[in-house]
A protein has these predicted regions:
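N-terminal glycine-/charge-rich "phosphate-binding" loop or analogous flexible N-terminal tail
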Residues: 1-46
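Short beta->alpha connector loops at strand-helix junctions that form conserved
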Residues: 32, 73-74, 90-101
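An anion/phosphate-binding loop that grips the pyrophosphate of nucleotide cofactors and donors
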Residues: 46, 64, 187
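Rossmann-like adenosine-cofactor binding region
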Residues: 56-61, 173-175, 179-259
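Phosphate-binding beta-alpha-beta segment of Rossmann-like dinucleotide-binding domains, i.e.
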Residues: 88, 96-150
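Glycine-rich Rossmann-fold phosphate-binding loop(s) that bind the pyrophosphate
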Residues: 156-157
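N-terminal Rossmann-fold NAD(P) dinucleotide-binding loop
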Residues: 160-161
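Rossmann-like dinucleotide-binding domain for NAD(H)/NADP(H)
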Residues: 168, 215-304
Length: 304
């Protein structure tokens, strides 16, 4: 069977091996990225498709009758029309919980950047401001202590639990939304760790933000679609909340018109929470395990 990978670069820009997948197929073709108008020609008669973010529509599946298996390289698979796949007898798998430690680490890193302003102070030193200072230390913005601060967690799966574990080790008070909605919403930090569904898309709207504690910080390392970006931008500018730290946006990469770009108290990283080499290797390992299970008649991580 032939395998086509539509968007392999973000998983393996050249520092890993595709060998485990190559061992399971007759031919492996890897594209760094695939625009929508190239999807049909690149998939062609191949039986197996691997993708992360490409939109896999019913129309594409129907035009590729040889397609038998779609492997998502992510935990979320909103980009795949799973109902269409089920209707057409195409297996779909995902990779759950592979990035727990990395995403939790990045969540805490974003929180620490908000409280300690590491980047700001490094830039200040590199610009010579410490050399010109008459004191042995200085700070451009107040540095906040996390000990005793509260963290509200919305979405208490593997990542949410790991974030809670680290936060408690730092002396924070953790409020889990499913146990205490009011406590979570009124925390000093509110961190999103829930999947994106039709029901919760855009749930971080004006009402949500106004109900947060004044001066609180929103953190999102889950899915960009959970947040109404215009509402968040307006809330930040109006001072309803103290800041935001985001690793995901509704559109990735964002357009230059994204309302969150250029806002001083909004930190954005380019969806890098999952990218440590160990995590990307885990993706390839899990892809191979899922595919081998399907080839052997198994159901490992099936979502169709």
């Amino acid at each position: 069977m032939d395998i086509v990978i539509f968007d392999g670069y973000t998983i393996n820009p050249g520092d890993l091996s595709w060998g485990k997948l190559e061992a399971l197929c007759g031919r492996l073709t890897v594209f760094d990225a695939t625009p929508p108008d190239k999807a049909l020609s690149r998939l062609g008669d191949s039986e197996i498709l691997i993708t992360s973010k490409c939109q896999i529509t019913r129309e594409l599946m129907e035009k590729c009758p040889n397609l038998k298996y779609i492997g998502s390289t992510a935990t979320g698979y909103n980009n795949i029309d799973v109902k269409a796949a089920a209707d057409l007898g195409i297996a779909v798998t995902n990779i759950p919980a592979y990035s727990t430690n990395a995403v939790a680490q990045h969540t805490i890193a974003l929180m620490l950047e908000i409280t300690n302003h590491v980047g700001l102070h490094d830039r200040s030193v590199q610009q010579g401001q410490w050399c010109e200072c008459e004191y042995f230390c200085y700070w451009k913005k107040p540095v906040l202590l996390l000990t005793g601060k509260s963290l509200g967690i919305i979405g208490y799966g593997a990542i949410g639990k790991k974030v809670a574990e680290i936060a408690r080790a730092l002396g924070m008070i953790v409020n889990v939304y499913s146990d205490d909605p009011e406590g979570a919403m009124k925390s000093d930090f509110v961190s999103l760790h829930c999947p994106l569904t039709e029901e919760n898309a855009g749930m971080v709207n004006t009402e949500f933000l106004v109900n947060m504690k004044p001066g609180a910080v929103l953190i999102n390392t889950a899915r960009g679609g959970l947040v109404d970006e215009r509402a968040l931008a307006d809330a930040l500018k109006a001072g309803f909340i103290g800041g935001a730290a985001l690793d995901v946006l509704a559109e990735e990469p964002p357009s230059k018109n994204c309302p969150l770009l250029g806002i001083e108290n909004c930190i954005i990283t380019p969806h890098i929470a999952w990218v440590p080499k160990e995590m990307r290797q885990a993706v390839i390992d899990n892809l191979a395990e899922n595919l081998k299970s399907w080839l052997d008649g198994g159901m490992l991580n099936r979502v169709d």
